[in-house]
């Protein structure tokens, strides 16, 4: 009964938000930030670890970059070594040029592949097909596409239970090769992703065998066509 009540409340909230979004209602107004701690100093990769051939700091931002002649064998990550947060809010600004990237959270590091991760990801790509969705790297794949509020039951596949907005309308909020504000909220079995002040995807994950309720944070360099991911103003609030 508690689960049904919780799910019903979130579905109702998502439906109301989708209606406001469809009518071009106001974005969620910014509020004063309290309780956030920076996890990137803007000057160095102190506290982070990854393959140095792909990662550097430039103009106050973490930069991960590949080229046609400089490719990882598999997707590789810059991993924050400051802990494995459970319930938290994560805020940062990102800029993506080229192929594909993502922000990992509640993830694990694979023991047999250096700097490889498995877990939840705030996905992003240069063509904006996937930006704003919740994905699981090396796991269950697409969990909540942009515009979706999805639910995963025990041993089940993701099911769309409501909408948080039209995917194409939300796509218009993405700034392409410019700075975007990402806000992730992870609390218990619930994950909310926001881009530039709008909710873009929501997930309730009750698949106890597949989900993780705590884990590492990381930034992805994706194998394949050349890409460049930049991230700055990275801050974390534990809930």
Please give the residue ranges for each predicted region.
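Sequence-pattern detector for short linear motifs
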Residues: 7-9, 109
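Carbohydrate-interacting regions of secretory-pathway proteins
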Residues: 19-239
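Low-complexity, intrinsically disordered short peptide segments enriched in small/polar/basic residues
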Residues: 6, 13, 157-158
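Bacterial N-terminal signal peptides that target proteins for export
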Residues: 1-7
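Hydrophobic h-region of N-terminal signal peptides that target proteins for export
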Residues: 10-19
């Amino acid at each position: 009964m508690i689960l049904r009540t919780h799910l019903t409340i979130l579905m109702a909230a998502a439906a109301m938000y989708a209606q406001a979004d469809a009518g071009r209602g106001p974005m969620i107004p910014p509020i004063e930030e309290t309780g956030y701690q920076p996890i990137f100093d803007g000057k160095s990769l102190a506290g982070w670890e990854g393959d140095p051939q792909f990662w550097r700091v430039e103009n106050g931002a973490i930069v991960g970059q590949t080229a046609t002649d400089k490719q990882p064998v598999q997707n590789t990550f810059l991993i924050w070594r400051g802990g494995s947060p459970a319930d938290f809010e994560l805020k940062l600004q990102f800029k993506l040029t080229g192929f594909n990237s993502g922000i990992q959270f509640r993830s694990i590091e694979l023991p047999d592949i250096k700097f490889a991760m498995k877990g939840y990801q705030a996905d992003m790509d240069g063509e904006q097909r996937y930006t704003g969705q919740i994905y699981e790297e090396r796991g269950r794949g697409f969990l909540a596409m942009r515009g979706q509020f999805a639910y995963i039951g025990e041993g089940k596949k993701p099911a769309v239970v409501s909408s948080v907005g039209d995917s194409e309308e939300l796509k218009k909020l993405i700034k392409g090769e410019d700075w975007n504000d990402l806000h992730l909220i992870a609390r218990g079995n619930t994950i909310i992703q926001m881009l530039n002040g709008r909710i873009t995807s929501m997930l309730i994950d009750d698949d106890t065998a597949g989900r993780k309720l705590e884990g590492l944070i990381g930034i992805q360099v994706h194998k394949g066509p050349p890409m460049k991911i930049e991230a700055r103003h990275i801050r974390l609030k534990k809930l």
